[in-house]
Amino acid sequence: MNILAVIPARYQSQRFPGKPLVMLDERPMVQWVYEAAKSCDFFQDAVVATDSDKIADCVKGFGGKVVMTRDDHLTGTDRVAEVAGFYDDMDVVVNVQGDQPFVTPEALEQLVRPYREGERPEMTTLGCPLDMDEDYASPNAVKVLCDRNGHALYFSRSPIPYFRTQGTVPVYHHLGLYAFRHDFLMQYSQLEPTPFETCEGLEQLRVLEYGYAIKVCQTQKAAIEINTPEDLVKAQLFIQQGMTS
């Protein structure tokens, strides 16, 4: 089983321009993510995908591998698919988001475990229990509802489901890590963007809208994502506290 990790890194982020290069404890964020991926012995290779010369120079500077991509990709997964096209010998391709400097090898192993155990899902992702008090109403926390077989029914930034009556149903906090069967990723990249994908701003909805399945693997805790300057402050505090909070 050959598995490739691709880290899409875009310089022109709308909410936080240049965020892959922000410094965390004397290392740029993209280096944190790259080193986390490289620490996983189940990845045959790891590479950063970018259209930015600044990011490419940074990656080369710390000894990482980088592939330059087109600058017209609509999503990170489209960028990952371009790179995957150069790696026909890979069975599975993992999209390790460049805004997750604290992603753990354990979380990445859970993401690819179905493939390593002989399953062949088109795509997997991760979910953890949602903090209903803190995150249920937040558009920055993506919610995912699953069917009885652990496949995603829908992802949304809105508070779903609506609780008309009192009761408890499992609502998961979606974590933006994805693994794809190589052949399916190539197929995904040829699909036109879809209405729900566009209105929610969630690329994984393209898969569901075309009738494909996403297996949601369970993990216990969400890692800090850096999408805004405010998130960077939280990340720096997390490091100061010994990365244990």
Swiss-Prot record:
Q: Which GO terms describe its molecular function?
A: 3-deoxy-manno-octulosonate cytidylyltransferase activity
Its function, per the record, reads:
Activates KDO (a required 8-carbon sugar) for incorporation into bacterial lipopolysaccharide in Gram-negative bacteria.
Domain of life, per lineage? Bacteria
Chief place where the protein resides = cytoplasm
Location relative to the cell: Cytoplasm
- So, what pathway does this thing act in? Nucleotide-sugar biosynthesis; CMP-3-deoxy-D-manno-octulosonate biosynthesis; CMP-3-deoxy-D-manno-octulosonate from 3-deoxy-D-manno-octulosonate and CTP: step 1/1; Bacterial outer membrane biogenesis; lipopolysaccharide biosynthesis
Read off the HAMAP family from this record. Answer: KdsB
Which UniProt keywords are given for this protein, alphabetically ordered?
Answer: Cytoplasm, Lipopolysaccharide biosynthesis, Nucleotidyltransferase, Transferase
What name does the UniProt record give this protein?
3-deoxy-manno-octulosonate cytidylyltransferase
Q: Organism, per UniProt?
A: Acaryochloris marina (strain MBIC 11017)
The keyword Cytoplasm belongs to this UniProt entry's keyword annotation: yes
In terms of CDD domains, this protein maps to: CMP-KDO-Synthetase
Into which family does the record put it?
Answer: Belongs to the KdsB family.
Which Gene3D superfamilies does the record match to this protein?
Answer: Spore Coat Polysaccharide Biosynthesis Protein SpsA, Chain A
Instruction: List GO BP terms, alphabetically.
Output: CMP-keto-3-deoxy-D-manno-octulosonic acid biosynthetic process; lipopolysaccharide biosynthetic process
Q: List the EC numbers from the record.
A: 2.7.7.38
Name the NCBIfam families on file.
Answer: kdsB, PRK05450.1-3, PRK05450.1-5, PRK13368.1
Give GO cellular component annotations, separated by semicolons.
cytosol
The reply on keyword Cytoplasm is yes
Disulfide bond positions: none
For this protein, what reaction is catalysed? 3-deoxy-alpha-D-manno-oct-2-ulosonate + CTP = CMP-3-deoxy-beta-D-manno-octulosonate + diphosphate
